Amino acid sequence: MKYRLSVICISVLLPPISGEMKVIDLTWAHSKEMPQWPVEGIPKFKLNIVNRGFLAKLWFEINWFVTPEHGGTHFDSPAHFAKGKWRAHEIPPERLIGPAVVIDVTSQAERDHDYRVTKSDFDRYEREHGRIPHGAIVLINSGWGARFQDKKLVFNSEKIDDPSTYHFPGYHEDAISWLLTNRNVSMVGVDTPSLDYGQSTTFKVHVLCGQNGIIGLENVANIDQIPVFGATIFVGAMKVFDGSGGPARIIATFDPLVSHEYRTTWIVVIVTSVLFGIYGIYITCFRMRRVGARHTE
């Protein structure tokens, strides 16, 4: 009876198992509506439709487009801010895949739109979820993704062509310096337009990342839809010869059973199983003692 009870309790506590990996798109659609950093001489995105209709009785679509490298969801090559470092076509493919680490600073960013991620945020993550793994792709969830459809909200400014008016979160250079020195990461990313916070004029985070061969990811979408640990990130970085960056299709995959919301459940299951095991041993020993006592009588 005790074993049946144990099985029933564990079955109730176990999370549902679908047997399927979840796939989350971390990419905003590339379009003329996407935010891009205003740099003189850089055109805005344009899609020119050459044919969208029947051609010789066959439906046929073909277009050409012009795009900035650093607009919408995109990657920064190390060469973007560091002379002589990898350009887009030189990035090793193994650097485009890695375990995700999501640093949640939504509450901090809500209070301070110029919030910069600090080493204490990394410390807090490691206390709760363990050491940042080798080759990690570190992503910041500041809640800024909810603003993406409105450029004024993304840059947090009424003057979207004037970077001096921008206010949005990013990394602090001291935190990045510690991360690059003490943890062997592959990429760092944000759900905002820049790795540096909006009021930066020196772009020290970009410089540090470039000098250390770290790829940057900006305007990453749906970070709030992946677990803080346990996901794998795949970055489809456009391989433009001599490019300083470019559009990226970023995908996350993960097993729901290792995501944060399931971990507590599994801890409860393990503890419950141990307790039932101890209870079973206790009952068995108690019965053996009673049987032994009867034989003695």
Tell what function each PLM region has.
Residues K2-I270, L275-E297:
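Active-/binding-site microenvironments in catalytic and ligand-binding cores
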